[in-house]
Amino acid sequence: MEPAAPDLQPVPEVTKGVPVPTPDSGCCRAAVTTVVAISVASLTLGVLSAFLSAQGVQVEHTAQLHGVRFTSLLQQENSDFYRLLTPALQTLLHFLLRALQPLSLDQEADILQKGIQARLQGQGLSLAAYGTITSVELTGRCEGPVTERDLKSGHCPGNAFSCQNSQCVSKENPECDDRVDCSDGSDEAQCDCGWQPAWRSAGRIVGGAEAAPGEFPWQVSLRENHEHFCGATIIGARWLVSAAHCFNEFQDPAQWAAQAGSVHLSGSEASAVRARVLRIAKHPAYNADTADFDVAVLELARPLPFGRYVQPACLPAATHVFPPRKKCLISGWGYLKEDFLVKPEVLQKATVELLDQNLCSSLYGHSLTDRMVCAGYLDGKVDSCQGDSGGPLVCEEPSGRFFLAGVVSWGIGCAEARRPGVYTRVTRLRDWILEVTSSADTPVVPTEAPAPITPSTPWPTSPESRVPNTTAKPTVAPTPAPLHPSTAAKPQECGARPAMDKPTRIVGGISAVSGEVPWQASLKEGSRHFCGATVVGDRWLLSAAHCFNHTKLEQVQAHLGTVSLLGVGGSPVKLGLRSVALHPRYNPGILDFDVALLELAQPLVFNKYIQPVCLPLAIHKFPVGRKCMISGWGNMQEGNATKPDILQKASVGIIEQKMCGALYNFSLTDRMLCAGFLEGRVDSCQGDSGGPLACEETPGVFYLAGIVSWGIGCAQAKKPGVYARITRLKDWILKAMSSDPSSTAHPHTSSTRLIPSQPPTTTAAGLIPEASTGRPATLRATIRVTTRPLNTTLSARSTTTRRQTPAPGTTVFSHLPDCGLAPPGALTRIVGGSAASLGEWPWQVSLWLRRREHRCGAVLVAERWLLSAAHCFDVYGDPMQWAAFLGTPFLSSTEGQLERVARIYRHPFYNIYTLDYDVALLELAGPVRRSRLVRPICLPGPTRPPEGARCVITGWGSLREGGSMARQLQKAAVRVLSEQTCRRFYPVQISSRMLCAGFPQGGVDSCSGDAGGPLACREPSGQWVLTGVTSWGYGCGRPHFPGVYTRVAAVLGWIGQNIRE
């Protein structure tokens, strides 16, 4: 009998970035193939939970995508679409299937295909726009009768939370979120934990930032014979969690002591306490060779006195989900550099990002187990190191509590690129940890408190092991508060930082330092500050539309470059407004579409005190719980109109939309976003309107998530701040910014556009910053972009001298009579172009990675020097991996010269996110052999090429967008576009180090694989000069998106200072 068609009901909850669970050993493995249109890379899909009621059978499936075939745009891993769309679609998809009997594999494949499509269409995603998935694999399939045991606590299916009364809660991470989900309240029963009274951005441990007293009150220094050896985390009054490998050699508890309540290794603070270790329990399955199950539980001889500086971190439930890309904190006293074996005196802190398990496993040769989790960044620079072992990896949840996600375990080197830190995954070992702590028969009521550390107090020792007194700096220790003999050591709030003053308000926030929020602007009417604004371009600010309900534009000025309302310090700038455009759908009654675009009367000159914030893509996701920064000069207290002289800042968490909608009686629209804390205390207030809600998406790079709009009161409990959601308004913003700036009409929308009676004073265009408002979507290289700094200076040699910077109007290599000479050739078209002949472009170089394949272009500018694009070397920065191929237009030729690259120098101001200063010098191991096939190009003078100049681009890149590489050098003629025209196509990304070339109608362009190649223009003398280096662009040959090139004239000084013959 054919089984009845199943009833497919996609469950509405979607959880981002959840890794695929590992199936039980009894599960079978089967592969099914399906074709699903979707826009995602290496996407992990979730659990199919099938409850077949008629047979009383429970079937679980685990599905994983394979064989993704991308469109050309998504092939660029450094594009905005790839970088932002991919994690946006990393979702756990739930399907509820009902059938009369188990399904066949063919039926499962059909259900899987339909279910995925239904779920993604439900999220409003276009399924056919970006690529095709060619196969899906069922990695697990387990079935059996649903027994009573399966429904008891700890046996809920999938990632469902198990209540003590056996209720299963399917909501992600319901424990300690300040909302009772279990009918017996057990999900909120043990939640004296995780509060963060103050938030500060973290630096690094390797080269890191110092932690403040009380900032990490769960951090412990484990001392082996008085020397700091490992870190540990407080999880209870008498219990610590650390790494098992810390005790490979020293397993006797008598050799160990714990120091808590101090950020100084010396324990010089009066808050420092110490306790002897009574017992060390390593996991029974710990493997010293593989570092699997690398966890240990330590029992202290005396309970710790919880207080302002000593608090436990929260243990997550076994079902707790820490999604990839979540920002978490590490801390420790480990080495600051891999090769600098000196530990810091002060506790170091860092922010790291959780990485996808499959990705990290591939980086480590698939040696990871399910008990491990990776955190860090692919480009390195931020990591734990030796001496940090056993310390905490803690993640803050929307409730404001910190949960222990991992224990510092191992890694290759410290902060190396593509070698993130590996941590013991606490959720997989939580049950064992609780088993150890609950099996102890020692009393939990303290008989005496651990002594505070003072100069006269010896370390606690056993009778068998006496040690001398400590030599801490003398301090006056206050008398500790007495503990009643019958009172257990109880945390005030587990995970709290009572010693840290939480930035309790821009209502009462903390002062920002100069340059900390360089995109913040103050809008003043006369001398009165009335609203904030945010810099998004050299001529553009964003603010709230309601700020201009009753404002005379001619009286408004924007003040920037300083944190002082009085204009003291920094680099203060005061500019008038040329126009204000309110969103055409702005509703002053409900404050929907509450955004305004302000055009400045003059362009800004960017510096370290004035910078734009990045605008997110429309598909950018700011996940619930993400910590973001608000800033402004608004009221410091509700009802108190006193404004601070110094800019205030605070950290707030993104709040789930449905929850916030319920708090505001469902009056929110999709153009609104909530941020703050349910308990209140942190909020924007009157006078902050129009200011930024900025989120740090990658280290040091902030994106504008919202604009301060409205709220009920200021910092009230359960009344968070409401912000205009930028992702929903981005299209209008860009359209408004791309209108003709010389127009005085209403060129872009029907919005209210106010024009002042006085015409603006025109000045020279200002510099564009090193961090712009948007990441270019397509680089011209075929290499993924990550950051790895390289040396940018050369040590002087006794036998050579540096070349002097050329005088204005001269050419660096004008002394080379044959530079820039080439046989005359027809200027045709690289995308849709024609092949170059032998010797036609003798300065063109192909850069080969590992001597296997062409990856980038380069240009010969001297006998042993090449110029290329800096982004070509973001991942592969070792010159030993590169070789230069010259003297032939054929990649498969055996005739050309192959030269080894000795050194790579990227411009010191190169910015990986904006591609500003995207240029690199390559020094060859030896001089090239000049001939009619190999000769350098001339470097230009300092002036810009004239608009409309006809120049040539060459390279072996793709012949069409998404196509294959050319095997013979291609050439194309393009027109140089004016800076104003270029900015109209790319309103916020263009800096003065960039120029555009191509045609408005498209059709002719450089493409992937051409990066680093030349944009060459012919002088009247017949010599060719290097005007630009191929850098980036949107797609290839698209209308209205010309190619963007690094302007060589803008970096002549740097080139001249570094090149020597």
Curated annotation (Swiss-Prot):
Glycosylation sites: 469, 549, 640, 665, 791
Post-translational modification: Proteolytically cleaved to generate 3 independent serine protease chains. The cleaved chains may remain attached to the membrane thanks to disulfide bonds. It is unclear whether cleavage always takes place.
GO biological process, one term: plasminogen activation
Cytoplasmic side: 3-31
Residues passing through the membrane, by range: 32-52
This protein's record includes keyword Transmembrane helix: yes
Coiled-coil zones: none
Uppermost EC category: hydrolase
Record note on domains: The serine protease 1 and 2 domains are catalytically active, whereas the serine protease 3 domain lacks the essential Ser residue of the catalytic triad at position 1011 and is predicted to be inactive.
Protein name: Transmembrane protease serine 9
Gene that produces this protein: Tmprss9
